[in-house]
């Protein structure tokens, strides 16, 4: 994948995010960040908000078109399980689904079902910028926005956040 050059965003590393991608998580993670930043003006995002946006954006392809993202894709199973367990309409709007998911993630079983999304994606997305497989090192090194990485990872009162670089609030791809 070749992303257009930018003086604001380090597209050299962003191109590498999507190399060797075997699951859709990184795509939906990035789309979630873009949605929250561009549509809602957020630069500091609760990881659960990004995950909710991921599920909402993948909902229609999975439920309506029955698109499977492959054998190693747990997002597909999580979406179907939520739809069946909570009888969520197939044609629900993204806005209504997002609102519903915000309510549902307050339930322990839903948080447990979706928790796999926050276990790796926030860290693996930053690997092209921060060359380490140690998640703790990724958190530490992201604090200085090493190599111009897109965001830093924070944890406050057991809640994880991403915080975009200050001048990255206008993402010019």
Which sequence ranges carry the predicted segments?
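Aromatic-enriched hydrophobic runs in primary sequence
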Residues: 7, 23-31, 38, 127, ...
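N-terminal accessory alpha/beta regions
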Residues: 41-150
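N-terminal ordered "arm"
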Residues: 5-47
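Conserved small/polar residues in nucleotide/adenosyl-binding loops
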Residues: 162-169
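Acidic, proline/serine/threonine- and glycine-rich low-complexity intrinsically disordered segments
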Residues: 158-159
